[in-house]
Amino acid sequence: MSGKPVLHYANTRGRMESVRWLLAAAGVEFEEKFLEKKEDLQKLKSDGSLLFQQVPMVEIDGMKMVQTRAILNYIAGKYNLYGKDLKERALIDMYVEGLADLYELIMMNVVQPADKKEEHLANALDKAANRYFPVFEKVLKDHGHDFLVGNKLSRADVHLLETILAVEESKPDALAKFPLLQSFKARTSNIPNIKKFLQPGSQRKPRLEEKDIPRLMAIFH
């Protein structure tokens, strides 16, 4: 065993992508064991690796961790991406939970029925422009630092960049009215570990397309 975290999930973004982002931002190398068929998932279930019979699952520090939030909290705490005190952690948690709501909206568009896709995406992009991005523009303005919390990189910054890029895949000019978020995106994208993760050939996964859904359904259903 190499000692690197091992990520068990399908070869897709899904609920593991934020884990990949956070490990990459922390400069932590990790391995991936992809579920390719239903039997791969069944094996993890039957050998007791999945506490609640679900992936994502991450092997780290002798544990087999499940539940995405628990995994992210552990990684953030272990690699000093979770603020310096309880108050900073509370802010980070608030920002991250809000971002998770927006990310979920964007991520779920691909699985909407054909006649609902356009409406669903329009709703998600409207919420990005009018509910979520204005919040983070104001946070950056009021806080007056390069990062959302304190004056160093936290998981909130990592998840904000991940979410911005996901929104821009559907609306490239999504940040047109948000100059501070534009600067934030440019700044954080150039942090060496993140810049490396954004290069072709990294372990970052492409956007889920409709053609990928049957493959995933065969594993998970």
From Swiss-Prot:
Q: What is its EC number?
A: 2.5.1.18
What is the enzyme's class at the highest EC level? transferase
Q: Which Gene3D superfamilies match?
A: 1.20.1050.10, Glutaredoxin (3.40.30.10)
- GO BP annotations, alphabetical order: glutathione metabolic process; xenobiotic metabolic process
Query: In which domain of life is the source organism classified?
Result: Eukaryota
InterPro entries registered for this protein in UniProt? Glutathione-S-Trfase_C-like (IPR010987), Glutathione-S-Trfase_C_sf (IPR036282), Glutathione_S-Trfase_N (IPR004045), GST_alpha (IPR003080), GST_C (IPR004046), GST_superfamily (IPR050213), Thioredoxin-like_sf (IPR036249)
Q: Name one GO molecular function term.
A: glutathione transferase activity
**Which residues belong to any copy of the GST N-terminal domain?**
3-83
Gene Ontology CC: extracellular space
Q: Where does glutathione bind?
A: 9, 45, 54-55, 67-68
Catalysed conversion reaction: RX + glutathione = an S-substituted glutathione + a halide anion + H(+); prostaglandin A2 + glutathione = prostaglandin A2-S-(R)-glutathione; prostaglandin J2 + glutathione = prostaglandin J2-S-(R)-glutathione; (13S)-hydroperoxy-(9Z,11E)-octadecadienoate + 2 glutathione = (13S)-hydroxy-(9Z,11E)-octadecadienoate + glutathione disulfide + H2O
A Pfam entry, by short name: GST_C_3
Q: Which keywords describe this protein according to UniProt?
A: Transferase
Complex and partners: Homodimer or heterodimer of GSTA1 and GSTA2.
Protein family membership: Belongs to the GST superfamily. Alpha family.
Please name the PANTHER family in this protein's record: GLUTATHIONE S-TRANSFERASE, GLUTATHIONE S-TRANSFERASE A1
Function of the protein:
Glutathione S-transferase that catalyzes the nucleophilic attack of the sulfur atom of glutathione on the electrophilic groups of a wide range of exogenous and endogenous compounds. Involved in the formation of glutathione conjugates of both prostaglandin A2 (PGA2) and prostaglandin J2 (PGJ2). It also catalyzes the isomerization of D5-androstene-3,17-dione (AD) into D4-androstene-3,17-dione and may therefore play an important role in hormone biosynthesis.
Q: What is this protein called?
A: Glutathione S-transferase
- Organism field: Gallus gallus (Chicken)
